[in-house]
Amino acid sequence: MQHPHGVQPWGNFLLNGGADIRSTGLGQLRVLSDDLLLTVLGLLPAKVLLSCSATSKALYCFCNHEELWRALTLQEFEGSFRYSGSWQHTYLAAAGLTEPGSQPSCGPLKVQGLYSDILYQPWFCATTPIREEWLERDNLERRSGLSLEDFRQHFELPNRPVVLSDAAKDWPAQKKWTRKYLRKAFKGQAVVAGNYPMAFDDFLAYSDGATDDMPLYLFDCEFAAKAPKLATDYKVPEYFAEDLFGVLGESARPHHRWLIMGPPRSGSSFHKDPNATSAWNAVVRGSKKWILFPPHITPPGVHASADGADVATPVSLVEWLLNFYDAAQRGGVRPLEGVVRAGEVLFVPRGWWHFAINLEETVAVTQNYVSSAGLPAVLAFLKTGRADLVSGCAEADRADLHERFVSALREQRPQVLESC
């Protein structure tokens, strides 16, 4: 496949030579790096950006870069848009500059002689097929019919991941949660996708048409309040029934459960779960590829600050797979990885780095929790008093979360507090 504007990676110029239209096409802007040029263009309003795109073939390619129009759309309209095949056309329709649902009168202009990794790479990551070698390795332990004691002794206490292959297979959600059912459940409600409130039908339209290298995906911690019947369609697996944050009450505890839905290639880049909690993730429809590293091994390509407050990762999940998956296999500690499918539940222990990419449109439920086994780690984390590291609750409630949690435990679960 060829980039829609004919842009090629910089390596092609180094290998093959030929004309380079960048310098002549950018004029005095040629002194700027591609990255800095896009930053400058990102400061322009849409109409100026369109005018600039008509000045030269080189600027045409930069000004039509999809990431610029995605940023403009989300900045100006947040989630109030209907995706229309490209981010530029989506913006123009949302701004009333074109008719909603109309198609561009002509296709994209293809140029020759423009070489830019920053323009080429997002398109390449969005269109390159998911490779079989990224999926074939499966060394996650899988168990069915596991007793509570076996789970505790073999997985929870040693802090080891496991796929519980039958933990969600009998949920009503497995049969109920079709698009039609979810559309009805969320009627009149906005869901959260990419941190923006969006009508559920608009999210589905985006999901069907998105060509992003890192697609937006639905990640909503208030789904049960917005669509109460969804909360009755699943049951917390017995292995995770103890959740000590519950002593704070639903309104005072950190956010702990989310509905997740997204198109292929959407998902979450490497991170550790908040507040030193453990988590479980149940796939209702679709499938997810998971990669996990133990707490003391930072994944290749990931750069974390000493306190964990800041984590830098590649922009897209496919970019990490392209650039770092092979390196991960050659490292001293290989990751645990595998595909989790509908009806299966992955236990993600506290502190583990994890990455998940949807292989198809996928719907899942995930919850973070604090068990007796995990309580010492959570209390130690909260005791630091670092409000900037606490997440899932109002900023004003973060600094004293440790104090409030201990007080509630002392009143409601004193034996657990004494034994930790």
List the predicted regions and their residue ranges:
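N-terminal accessory scaffold of Fe(II)-dependent oxygenases
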Residues: 2-38, 42-345, 355-420
